[in-house]
């Protein structure tokens, strides 16, 4: 993984994340970036800009 130093098992300097739907090239994706398209309505899940996780929009749990 280019975001981690294999020798130390730690993140490389400047890396914010190593994986996740809201992680792109070791950085958190911008707030509002669609990370999961809704198949039911138009309330797509979007990145927060603060995490690599893709939070649910909360409407359907």
UniProtKB/Swiss-Prot annotation:
Its main location: secreted. PROSITE patterns: DISINTEGRIN_1, DISINTEGRIN_2. Disulfide bonds join 3-26, 17-23, 22-47, 35-54. Residues 1-61 form the Disintegrin domain. A motif (Cell attachment site) lies at residues 39-41. It is found in: Secreted. It comes from the Eukaryota. SUPFAM superfamilies: Blood coagulation inhibitor (disintegrin) (SSF57552). The keyword tRNA processing does not apply. InterPro entries: Disintegrin_CS, Disintegrin_dom, Disintegrin_dom_sf. The keyword Acetylation does not apply. Expressed by the venom gland. One of its GO terms (molecular function) is toxin activity. Gene3D superfamilies: Disintegrin domain (4.10.70.10). Monomer. Belongs to the venom metalloproteinase (M12B) family. P-II subfamily. P-IIa sub-subfamily. Recombinant disintegrin rubistatin inhibits ADP-induced platelet aggregation. In addition, it strongly induces apoptosis, and inhibits cell migration and proliferation of the human cancer cell line SK-Mel-28. Negative results: does not induce chromatin fragmentation (apoptosis) in T24 and HeLa cells. The disintegrin belongs to the medium disintegrin subfamily. This is Disintegrin rubistatin.
């Amino acid at each position: 993984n280019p975001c981690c130093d294999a020798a130390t098992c730690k993140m490389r300097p400047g890396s914010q994340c190593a994986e996740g739907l809201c992680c792109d090239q070791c950085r958190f994706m911008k707030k509002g970036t669609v990370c999961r398209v809704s198949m039911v309505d138009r309330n797509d899940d979007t990145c927060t800009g603060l995490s690599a996780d893709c939070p649910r929009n909360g409407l359907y749990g």
